[in-house]
Amino acid sequence: MYSLNRLPRSAAFKSSANLLRRNASTTSAGGVNVVGFENKGPAATSSLTVAIKAGSRYETTPGVAHVLKSFAYKATASASALRTAREAELYGGVLSAALTREHLLLSAEFLRGDEEHFLNVLASVLSSSQFYRHELSELVLPVVEAETISSQAIPSTIALDLAHSLAFRRGLGNSLYANKNYPVSIDDVKSFGEAAFAKSNIAVIGTGVSTEALAKAVSNAFGAGTSSGSKLSTPKANYYGGETRVPLDIHAPATATPTMVIAFGTSSPASADLKVLKHLLGGETSVKWTPGASPLAQAADKIPGASAKAFLLPYSDAALFGVVLSAPTSAETKTLAQEVASIVKNAGEFKEEEVKRAVAKATFEDAASTETLSGFVAAAGPAALVGSVPEAQSFSGVSASSISKAAGELLKGKPTVVSIGNISVLPYADELGL
């Protein structure tokens, strides 16, 4: 096994914490926080994203955040949904909307120089969406229902959604998907949208455009159009934990396999130690067509068609850390779960050399994640909402002892266990020694 101490380290590795700050800058324009990220070389395209603090944790009615996301780019005071779509096509741009547990993200990607048009489109969505009743029934709800049904066909998606509900109950525990058993009215959407689209609740993130040019365009586009109400708020997240078991629907697609999630949570933001611990447990491979050398990868490799991967889902005031595992049959999933539980219970027992390798992986992942638009927005969104620029995580203080301490604190909490499959076969949490 090669030692990292013998390998030359690049300057980027040694100063990764400065990579983002080098080209990103922030300012305020007309009461809206603005973050611009200029490319080092000439770029033919630019992008704009409005980050709105209106994720599912802030919703006042179950599913209203999902419905509001699907109302994006419908009729506004200045254009119909058809006109908005056609003009985007004529400019060669792409409009999209995404929902996370903390943010609603409205994005536009386009040829450089067209930022004024697309910023006006985004501003009109926030300031003058009409929320017509016929659009809700004819255009929005069918899409919402289709997205919900699609998510229910993927056991891992169901398991992670249920895991959040068990771990955090309300707030972060709210589902990302609307449920037809809890109808959302047009008045619910209007009320939530009015609060969500307040200037104090949004930030604009631009890539391939200077902060100065972006700030000027934001001042012109947003002006006094958006409301200036107070921010949406939610109580601080608390971790609880729990267990639930769901039969795998006989109507599920053939690709659906028995799945389990074994997780633990924190009531504070994710630490550098947890980011490194995710790579220590692993499940992913660094070389294609090989099983991988991490404990989880080795465990899954014993069962053909099985997988076990560590995950870390960070939020502003909490985090969920765990393993999602699956196998072709419930009996095989039980066998894998027993080995995974043993690995998790010994998560703090790693050698210094193993920690160094995991730190290198975590540093690379942290830096590489911002190279894509979605990754940069995920990093810049929370920072922009508080008027700062995103910064890469520092892993300089991570060691085998700090990992052991972090893992010990994590495992003190009540586990969150979700089982999907043949529930007469899949193990209970106490049977796994958790």
From Swiss-Prot:
It is a peripheral membrane protein. It is found in: Mitochondrion inner membrane. Residues 1-31 form a transit peptide. It holds the Pfam family Peptidase_M16. GO terms for biological process: mitochondrial electron transport, ubiquinol to cytochrome c. GO terms for molecular function: metal ion binding; ubiquinol-cytochrome-c reductase activity. GO terms for cellular component: mitochondrial inner membrane; respiratory chain complex III. Keywords: Electron transport, Membrane, Mitochondrion, Mitochondrion inner membrane, Respiratory chain, Transit peptide, Transport. InterPro entries: Metalloenz_LuxS/M16, MPP/UQCRC_Complex, Pept_M16_N, Peptidase_M16_C. Belongs to the peptidase M16 family. UQCRC2/QCR2 subfamily. Component of the ubiquinol-cytochrome c oxidoreductase, a multisubunit transmembrane complex that is part of the mitochondrial electron transport chain which drives oxidative phosphorylation. Component of the ubiquinol-cytochrome c oxidoreductase (cytochrome b-c1 complex, complex III, CIII), a multisubunit enzyme composed of 10 subunits. The complex is composed of 3 respiratory subunits cytochrome b (COB), cytochrome c1 (CYT1) and Rieske protein (RIP1), 2 core protein subunits COR1 and QCR2, and 5 low-molecular weight protein subunits QCR6, QCR7, QCR8, QCR9 and QCR10. This is Cytochrome b-c1 complex subunit 2, mitochondrial.
